[in-house]
Design a protein with these regions (language model features):
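Class I S-adenosyl-L-methionine
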Residues: 1-18, 23-25, 30-101
Length: 101
């Protein structure tokens, strides 16, 4: 068991061009061993694609997260809680997680 939890970082990828990521965003993505990213039903991970245009993430553990677009609040909350549990599992192992969005 790890006595120290990892840190969660939210990293915005900006308007869509990889060269517009901030230096701080790039540095955080370099330092974190786990990168979480929203994934569409078709499997697309647009925020991750943008980040990968700025730096090589092949050595990172990629955590795809699914969020429902349902109008039903309970279903949305369930998808948020599922994503939180997935991220928390890495944090409890002492691994830092950066979520791109």
């Amino acid at each position: 068991m790890n006595d120290t939890n990892g840190t969660f970082y939210a990293v915005g990828v900006g308007p869509g061009a990889p060269e517009l990521l901030t230096l701080q965003a790039v540095n955080l993505l370099r330092q974190c061993p786990v990168i979480a990213a929203p994934q569409t039903r078709s499997g697309q991970m647009l925020a991750l694609d943008i980040a990968q245009g700025a730096l090589d993430l092949r050595e990172k553990e990629i955590l795809p997260l699914s969020f429902t677009m349902s109008r039903e609040p309970a279903l949305r909350e369930e998808s948020y809680q599922t994503a939180a549990r997935q991220i928390e599992a890495f944090l409890q192992k002492g691994l830092d997680v950066a979520m791109v969005n």
